Design a protein with these regions (language model features):
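A short, N-terminal "cap"/entry segment at the start of jelly-roll beta-barrel domains
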Residues: 1-46, 54, 59-60
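Detector for glycine-centered tight turns/loop "hinges" at secondary-structure junctions
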Residues: 29, 50, 84-86
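Short beta-strand segments in beta-sandwich/barrel cores
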Residues: 52-53, 75-80, 103
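Short acidic-glycine-tyrosine-enriched beta hairpin
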Residues: 82-100
Length: 126
C-alpha cells in the first residue's frame, strides 16, 4: 500500500475495516481487514478457535510476524516471543508484540482484536 498524499486529504479521516475492501482470509477461514486512515491503519481481526500465526498465516504472508500493537475485544490469545516467554492476552487488554513472535487462539471462542499500524510501516501484506 502506498502512503496517502496527506496534502490532498481532509483533516478528518474515517473508515470501516469491514467495508474497506481490504480483507485477508486465512487458510482456516479467520479474517483480518483494515481501514487506512491518514496516519494509521486500523485492523479488525476475527481469529477462529485453533488459529495460529505460524500455521495459518506465516506461509500465506510470506514472512515472519512483525511488531503488533492491539487490543483484544473478546476471546483469548496466547503469545510466545522469540525468547520463549509466553503471555495470555484476554479481553480488555492492550498489547504490543515483538517481531518474530507466534500467537494462537486459546479456548473455544473466536478472538476478536483490533490492531494499529502506523502508515509508514503498513503494507498490504500485513
Amino acid at each position: 500500500m502506498t502512503k496517502p498524499d496527506k496534502s490532498s486529504q481532509p483533516s478528518i479521516a474515517k473508515g470501516n475495516p469491514s467495508t474497506a475492501g481490504n480483507t485477508r482470509v486465512f487458510v482456516d477461514g479467520s479474517t483480518r481487514s483494515y481501514a487506512a486512515l491518514r496516519t494509521a491503519a486500523i485492523g479488525f481481526g476475527t481469529y477462529k478457535p485453533g488459529w495460529r500465526w505460524s500455521l495459518h498465516a506465516r506461509s500465506q504472508m510470506g514472512k515472519d510476524s512483525e511488531n503488533h500493537i492491539g487490543y483484544i475485544i473478546s476471546g483469548h490469545m496466547m503469545v510466545k516471543d522469540p525468547s520463549g516467554n509466553e503471555a495470555e492476552i484476554e479481553p480488555g487488554c492492550a498489547f504490543e508484540i515483538a517481531p518474530g513472535s507466534d500467537a494462537w487462539v486459546i479456548g473455544d471462542e473466536p478472538c476478536i482484536a483490533l490492531d494499529f499500524i502506523p502508515i509508514r510501516d503498513h503494507s498490504v501484506s500485513q
